[in-house]
Amino acid sequence: MPTKAGTKSTANKKTTKGSSKSGSSRGHTGKTHASSSMHSGMLYKDMVNIARSRGIPIYQNGSRLTKSELEKKIKRSK
């Protein structure tokens, strides 16, 4: 039993990444709201898909655009 509690606490430590999502989401959405109100938290994959569907090039000078660059382009083409 005590070992279970011990592993539980370590598991909790590990999962703080996942659980902190809901905890820090208030601060997080506040941050992302300023940069992109269309999606509170967009994944790079989502942005690439949106860019593709709108005909925005994902590659520039032979290298992939960063998330923020993609976001800017998507916003401009909105």
Curated annotation (Swiss-Prot):
The keyword Metal-binding does not apply. One of its GO terms (cellular component) is virion nucleoid. Residues 1-27 have a biased composition (Low complexity). It is found in: Virion. GO terms for molecular function: DNA binding. Keywords: DNA-binding, Early protein, Virion. Residues 1-41 are annotated as: Disordered. The keyword Cell division does not apply. Induction: Expressed in the early phase of the viral replicative cycle. It comes from the Viruses. May play a role in genome packaging through direct interaction with viral DNA. Binds to ssDNA and dsDNA with the same apparent affinity in vitro. Belongs to the asfivirus P10 family. This is Structural DNA-binding protein p10. It comes from African swine fever virus (strain Badajoz 1971 Vero-adapted) (Ba71V). The lineage of its organism: Viruses, Varidnaviria, Bamfordvirae, Nucleocytoviricota, Pokkesviricetes.
